[in-house]
């Protein structure tokens, strides 16, 4: 999974082939869609592009403040998407991207099932390059 502007879930088959995927708006994109597409909902605070600081994320499951409720709803929707994908695939999940740490922090499906791999794309490119050079 790549948790960036879009949460991209990619299934890889046992023999290493593309097995399909799912795409949903990422954390910031969902918040922006609510703020821009709904009268009365505020814009959320501008956060750095690289991460969502834990101290600004609401810890309550049902926050009373509007922005906190928006943030909590988005993270719960993303986690539910990941949980259903994991149940359907029955495999391990690797997550990378700017929101990966936020999702892993709030994941309750077992740490052995969701592995944070910050440089997953770079590792894949290195593996591909090694395979190409050995052919």
Protein language model regions, located:
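Phosphate-binding/catalytic loop of phosphoryl-transfer enzymes
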Residues: 1-38, 72, 76-84
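Glycine-rich beta-strand-to-loop/alpha-helix junction loops that act as flexible
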Residues: 3-5, 91-100, 118
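Structural motif
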Residues: 17-18, 92-94, 113-114
């Amino acid at each position: 999974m790549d948790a960036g502007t879009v949460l991209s879930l990619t299934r890889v088959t046992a023999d290493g082939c593309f097995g399909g995927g799912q795409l949903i708006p990422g954390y910031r994109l969902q918040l922006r869609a609510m703020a821009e597409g709904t009268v009365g909902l505020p814009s959320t605070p501008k956060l750095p592009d690289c991460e969502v600081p834990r101290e600004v994320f609401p810890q309550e499951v049902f926050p009373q403040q509007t922005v906190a409720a928006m943030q909590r709803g988005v993270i719960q929707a993303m986690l539910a998407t990941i949980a259903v994908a994991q149940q359907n695939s029955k495999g391990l999940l690797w997550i990378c991207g700017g929101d990966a740490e936020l999702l892993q922090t709030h994941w309750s499906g077992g740490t052995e099932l969701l592995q944070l791999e910050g440089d997953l794309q770079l590792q894949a490119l290195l593996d591909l390059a090694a395979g190409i050079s050995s052919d």
